[in-house]
Amino acid sequence: MARLAGVDLPPGKRAEIGLTYIYGIGRTRSKSLLHRAGIDFDKKIRDLTEDEINKVRTILEEEGAVEGDLRKEISMNIKRHIEMGSYRGLRHRRSLPVRGQRTHTNARTRKGPRRGTVANKKKATGKT
């Protein structure tokens, strides 16, 4: 089983798809990695030689952050915005959408489940 950036790659998948299991690598970046390493996109992970895996590993190290380093970098950027007191930091702190989306309706994923108001609960119990 091939292991890159601390992630076990699924042996039955094509190399192009298998690399996307690493956080920070999508289809486009996966294709460019394989192209630079000279590996066929349709080759299965189990069929990759140790030399080919090492090529991909060295290219990954050159290109930039993936997996844990990328997660840490993103969380540090969010903390920096919060500490700076910027508008984006305020939106992160309040768990609201950061990039200008409407919140009067929608934004349920970011805001979480609906919280009913106390006044509505009193009215509902008083009518029975």
Curated annotation (Swiss-Prot):
One of its GO terms (biological process) is translation. Residues 89-128 have a biased composition (Basic residues). Keywords: Ribonucleoprotein, Ribosomal protein, RNA-binding, rRNA-binding, tRNA-binding. It comes from the Bacteria. GO terms for cellular component: cytosol; small ribosomal subunit. Residues 85-128 are annotated as: Disordered. The keyword rRNA-binding applies. One of its GO terms (molecular function) is rRNA binding. SUPFAM superfamilies: S13-like H2TH domain. The keyword Ribonucleoprotein applies. Belongs to the universal ribosomal protein uS13 family. Part of the 30S ribosomal subunit. Forms a loose heterodimer with protein S19. Forms two bridges to the 50S subunit in the 70S ribosome. HAMAP family: Ribosomal_uS13 (MF_01315). This is Small ribosomal subunit protein uS13. It comes from Solibacter usitatus (strain Ellin6076).
